[in-house]
């Protein structure tokens, strides 16, 4: 048995069992090489539709397609060995009907070999979540700020910060949990509300701009590494790789223009003639 085949990959039930346990660590990844790095330290790798912003320069996640998610999901699966890989269902791939959602989710699971899918929405998506889970599709929910709804929300603003706005978000979280999701992301929600939801639902909550009381946390990798020019309020920068990468590129360009690169150690000499 190879070393790789001996490593057990985490599953949705493993994450479900972490409710009120050790905090769940989740980061995004879209490439095999970053997945290999994230895999060593994280419980879950999210192949997020944020790849539309990070990789393709879209202003929102709305233009992301199912084929784009599958392509990057396959890359992340090849680069990782032990983390649960969750792939986002992009806008337009699941909202029309339960059947559409199952067809899209089945493609993701079959073509990437990932362990779960994630979809946005609460009460309105509960029936779809139940339909998927009943047919063998592990689902991670997503409530609070739902970026795919930007055209109806109008802006990426935190939710639940005004009096009288908690009830719909609580209803969404409860509906997701009762529908059979194994966990849920809570994004950009007032801290006391995120804490209350975490205490009230039976499945793990994973916060992003929510509360330290959540059962886990997630960030976009490029945000926390300092590769994004701007980052949301809820991001802590654990590195500033942007300036480091630019300095390396500047050095390369300088050496090429001055003919300092390639040096003798970077080129191939002729083989000696056979005697």
UniProtKB/Swiss-Prot annotation:
Alphabetized UniProt keyword annotations: Cytoplasm, Magnesium, Metal-binding, Pantothenate biosynthesis, Transferase
Q: A Gene Ontology MF term for this entry?
A: 3-methyl-2-oxobutanoate hydroxymethyltransferase activity
Please give the GO cellular component terms listed in this UniProt entry. Answer: cytoplasm
Q: What is its EC number?
A: 2.1.2.11
Q: Where in the cell is it found?
A: Cytoplasm
Cofactor mode of binding and number, as noted: Binds 1 Mg(2+) ion per subunit.
- Please list the cofactors this protein needs: Mg(2+)
Name by which UniProt lists this protein: 3-methyl-2-oxobutanoate hydroxymethyltransferase
Q: Gene for this protein?
A: panB
């Amino acid at each position: 048995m190879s070393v790789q085949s001996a490593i057990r990959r985490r599953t949705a039930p493993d994450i479900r069992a972490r409710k009120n346990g050790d905090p769940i660590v989740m980061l995004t990844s879209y490439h095999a090489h970053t997945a290999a790095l994230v895999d060593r330290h994280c419980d879950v790798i999210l192949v997020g539709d944020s790849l539309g912003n990070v990789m393709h320069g879209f202003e929102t996640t709305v233009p992301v397609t199912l084929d784009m998610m599958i392509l990057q999901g396959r890359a992340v699966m090849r680069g990782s060995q032990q983390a649960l890989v969750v792939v986002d269902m992009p806008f337009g791939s699941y909202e029309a009907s339960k059947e559409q959602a199952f067809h899209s989710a089945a493609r993701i699971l079959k073509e990437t070999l990932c362990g779960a899918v994630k979809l946005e929405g609460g009460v309105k998506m509960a029936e779809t979540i139940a339909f998927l889970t009943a047919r063998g599709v592990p689902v991670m929910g997503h409530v609070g700020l739902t970026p795919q709804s930007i055209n109806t929300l109008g802006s990426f603003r935190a939710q639940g910060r005004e009096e009288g706005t908690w009830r719909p978000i609580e209803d969404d979280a409860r509906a997701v949990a009762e529908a059979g999701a194994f966990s849920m992301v809570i994004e950009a929600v007032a801290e006391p509300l995120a804490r209350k939801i975490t205490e009230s639902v039976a499945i793990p909550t994973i916060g992003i701009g929510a509360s330290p009381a959540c059962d886990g946390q997630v960030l976009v990798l490029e945000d926390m590494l300092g590769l994004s020019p701007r980052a949301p309020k809820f991001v802590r920068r654990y590195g500033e790789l942007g300036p480091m990468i630019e300095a390396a590129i500047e050095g390369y360009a300088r050496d090429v223009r001055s003919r300092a690169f390639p040096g003798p150690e970077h080129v191939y000499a002729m083989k000696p003639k056979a005697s």
